Regions:
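C-terminal cap/substrate-recognition subdomain and adjoining C-terminal extension
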Residues: 2-111
Length: 111
């Protein structure tokens, strides 16, 4: 079996909702700041955009196998921590295909 873990730079309320939809057991995301009255102040406390490598490293210490799927080039820093890395290239982004190919990624999904 496997465990779905969502690691996304989107803000936590959105990530939690997506996590529920895909059956994620754990969700790691950027976090909004809230006041003591639980009102969002519009700022981000922790931003995962371009900063997922530390979380991936922690997951690699306790996981038998890590498969990473992304369409974000800044996630290339996580390649070395994964057993399998799958890049997704959105329609109209041919340069992204070359980017992933140059990084040695063999599994590239073009939409």
């Amino acid at each position: 079996g496997f465990e779905v873990i969502l690691l996304s730079a989107t803000v936590d309320p959105v990530a939690e909702s997506i996590g529920e939809c895909v059956g994620a057991k754990r969700v790691y995301s950027s976090e909004l700041n809230f006041s003591s009255k639980n009102i969002c102040d519009g700022t981000i406390g922790r931003d995962l955009l371009g900063n997922k490598k530390d979380t991936m490293y922690e997951l690699s210490l306790v996981s038998n196998e890590l498969v990473f799927v992304t369409d974000n080039k800044s996630d290339s820093s996580c390649i070395e921590l994964c057993d399998e890395f799958i890049a997704v290239v959105p329609s109209g982004r041919k340069k992204n295909y070359e980017f992933w190919k140059d990084k040695g990624i063999r599994r590239i999904i073009c939409l």
